[in-house]
C-alpha cells in the first residue's frame, strides 16, 4: 500500500512512522509512506498557504492552490487509484469499519489541515472527509497518525499473529474479553480456572460471554443492530437478567 500525507509539519511523522508496527511494515515493504509539505508548492515569495476568509470571520483558511498542486504532484508519482482523505471535524467519524474499508485500497492520501479550516474548493479533490471524534485538534496530523495505524495493522503480514487483528476490540463488533498471562496467581489475583483447563470449547464460550458482558456494561450502544448467534443472544439475555437482579 502507498500512503501519502500532505502536511505543513512533516517532521511530526518522523517518530511514529519509524517505530513499532508501522516501522516494521515499511521495512518489510508492506507499505510505503511519503510525507509532502504543501508549503513547498506555494507561488508567492513569502510561501503563504493561508488567507483571510471572504465575508469576514475569525481565523485563516488554507488556500486551494498549494494543496491542489501538491496533490497533483503526488498523483503523478503514484498514479494507483485510491482514496483522498480530508481530515475534517465535519467528516464521518472514524471507526474500525472505516479502517477496514481503507485497508482494501492500494493508495491512501491524507490531507492534514491547519488554521481555521479549508477553502471549500479543496473538498472537490477528496473522496472522503473523516473526523477522529467530536473534539478539535490543532491540526490533522495526529488524526492521520491514528487512522494510518488502525488501517496498516489490518494489512496481511503486518501483525505477527494473523489472528490478532480479527480478535481485537471492535473488529468483532464487541469489546475484547479479559486476558491474562503468567503468573497464574499474582498477589492473590488469580487467573480464572477456565483459562487453565485446556478445554478450548469452554474457553471460547467464556471469552464470548465476557466480551458480551464487557460490551453491555461499557458500550451498550455497540450492541444495537449487531448480528448475534443464538448462543450469544442467550448469553446476553442471561447477563441482562443478572444485572437487573443486582
Curated annotation (Swiss-Prot):
Its main location: cytoplasm. Its EC number is 2.1.1.228. GO terms for cellular component: cytosol. It comes from the Bacteria. One of its GO terms (biological process) is tRNA N1-guanine methylation. Pfam families: tRNA_m1G_MT (PF01746). S-adenosyl-L-methionine binds at residues 113, 132-137. Keywords: Cytoplasm, Methyltransferase, S-adenosyl-L-methionine, Transferase, tRNA processing. It is an enzyme of class 2 (transferase). Belongs to the RNA methyltransferase TrmD family. Homodimer. This is tRNA (guanine-N(1)-)-methyltransferase.
Amino acid at each position: 500500500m502507498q500512503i501519502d500525507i500532505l502536511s505543513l509539519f512533516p517532521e511530526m511523522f518522523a517518530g511514529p512512522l519509524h517505530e513499532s508496527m508501522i516501522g516494521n511494515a515499511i521495512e518489510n515493504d508492506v507499505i510505503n509512506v511519503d510525507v509532502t509539505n504543501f508549503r513547498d508548492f506555494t507561488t508567492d515569495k513569502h510561501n503563504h498557504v493561508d488567507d483571510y476568509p471572504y465575508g469576514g470571520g475569525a481565523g485563516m483558511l488554507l488556500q486551494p492552490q498549494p494543496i491542489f498542486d501538491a496533490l497533483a504532484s503526488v498523483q503523478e508519482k503514484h498514479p494507483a487509484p485510491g482514496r483522498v482523505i480530508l481530515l475534517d471535524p465535519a467528516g464521518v467519524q472514524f471507526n474500525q469499519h472505516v479502517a477496514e474499508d481503507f485497508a482494501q485500497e492500494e493508495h491512501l492520501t491524507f490531507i492534514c489541515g491547519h488554521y481555521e479550516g479549508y477553502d471549500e474548493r479543496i473538498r472537490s479533490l477528496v473522496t472522503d472527509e473523516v473526523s477522529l471524534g467530536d473534539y478539535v485538534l490543532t491540526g490533522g496530523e495526529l488524526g492521520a497518525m491514528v487512522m494510518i495505524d488502525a488501517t496498516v495493522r489490518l494489512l496481511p503480514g503486518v501483525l505477527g499473529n494473523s489472528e490478532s487483528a480479527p480478535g481485537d476490540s471492535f473488529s468483532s463488533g464487541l469489546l475484547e474479553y479479559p486476558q491474562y498471562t503468567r503468573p497464574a496467581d499474582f498477589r492473590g489475583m488469580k487467573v480464572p480456572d477456565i483459562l487453565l483447563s485446556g478445554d478450548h470449547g469452554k474457553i471460547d464460550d467464556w471469552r464470548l460471554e465476557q466480551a458480551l458482558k464487557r460490551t453491555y456494561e461499557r458500550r451498550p450502544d455497540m450492541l444495537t443492530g449487531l448480528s448475534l448467534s443464538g448462543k450469544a443472544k442467550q448469553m446476553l439475555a442471561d447477563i441482562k437478567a443478572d444485572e437487573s437482579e443486582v
